[in-house]
Amino acid sequence: MNKIYYFILFCFAAFCFTACSDDDPEFSGIEGKDHYISDFALNVGGITYQATIAGDKITVEIPYNTDLEGATAAYTLSEGATINPNPSTIQDWENEWKFVVTSKMQESKVYSYTYRYADIEQSGSVVLATQADVDNFAETGINRIDGNLTIGTADGEEITNLEGLANLKQISNTLILNPSYKGADLSGLDNLEQLGSFKLGSIVSTSKNTTLKTVNLPSLLGVVGDFVINSSVIEKVSIPKVTTIGEDLYVASDALLDLDANAVESIGSSLIVKGSVIQKGSATTEAIVFSALKRVGSELAIQYFPKLQGIYLPALESVAGTASFTDMALIGSIAMTELYSAGGLTIKNCKEISTIELPGLTSCGEFSVDANKVNKFNISALRDAFGNMTLSNLLIEELDLSRINFNGNTLTLQCNRLNKIVGSETFNGNLLLLPKSCRLTEFTLEGILNMQGNFECEDYSLVKRFIMPFVNVAGDITIALNSGSVDTGV
């Protein structure tokens, strides 16, 4: 009896399942769940450009100068899926689109469409000697040059605009501008992103181009080699997105008004900015700013700016060579608060400078400051002097040297108001006190017991009391006082 009961129950359940299945769509395997685009392409003028589909991104790569007007789409969906909007209804393929693909089971996936230009590379150097050459370059669609690009000649046909270079994004070697280019700026190179190097003139010779006033490369991101401008007429240099320059950044111009390189963080070799091409201050620049610069691989020099009032290097940490600031009549202060290492430092012919702030400097090579209005001088973190140090004409009255190791080098002090020096117990170097026309009546050396080098002091003609508590002087000692007494333990 039980067997008959279970048999009847089984048949009833099977009947119900069959009845329910008749009411639902029939799916085989995963057929009803798929919601993807398996193939996508655009056809432009009879040419098909196959898309790359990566995840939910559809990207069509087309050559430069390709017009997508009139383009049509071909695509393949998973079986049973639908797409919205329908690509066959779209005419404007220069815009980005989003497509929703929906499966039979109403599961959806969103795809994003975009396009990009394919690189067309020219192997070898390119010379564009005439305006026609520049104009015709646009028709090639080339956006990368694996070599030099030379624009113009020494004295040939004039080139007045660079619009034919609008597609250009990369020059692996040097961009050279010759005098026959007569444009006032570099409009046409607005999309250039990478350069091997840039040459307008050279470090040793001035460009003969007299019409170019502005070097503007708004999209440039990096320079592998040198960026050199040596011109008597350049007024503005604008490379606002460049972050690295592999070798030299050299800018010299009699007419320089503005330099925008505020994204530059690293310069592999030297940074040289001059307000003159003939070592005579001419440019009327009032401020020089490198707000992101951290490292200079060799020399740093800013010089020949008679109107310059501010130098701003707030992020600068290291200069492998000498940092020199010279021939700037109006500069009032130099502050490099993050600088911790310099191969050397020179400040001279800056007659209005009163403040020198180097609070983080811990090591320096040859160090020379000659400035007769400096009354604030901060080198409080200095620990190692790896070259001679000379301070001339500063208005400081006290100087603390107690934490500095001079490593056998010479400290020369020619400061008429300096009346007190504090040193460590052992002074590891030579100390020369050589003021000019000094009118001090008292001078004190405090803390120094052992002088490991030479000691010399001269021209303290009015000093009545000269205190130096030396116990030992390893080298020569010279003391020339016209009057007064010397209190020493030597």
Q: Which residues does each predicted region cover?
A:
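Bacterial N-terminal signal peptides that target proteins for export
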Residues: 1-8
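C-terminal motif of bacterial Sec signal peptides marking the signal peptidase cleavage site
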Residues: 16-19
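Beta-rich interaction/scaffold domains
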Residues: 21-138, 142-149, 167-173, 193
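Small-residue (G/S/T/A) turn/hinge positions that recur once per unit in extracellular repeat modules
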Residues: 45-51, 80-84, 166, 219, ...
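Extended Gly/Ser/Thr-rich low-complexity repeat segments
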Residues: 68-79, 290, 401, 423-424, ...
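Concave beta-strand-loop units of leucine-rich repeat
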Residues: 126-129, 146-160, 172-188, 194-235, ...
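Disulfide-braced loops of extracellular cysteine-rich modules
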Residues: 134-139, 161-163, 186, 259, ...
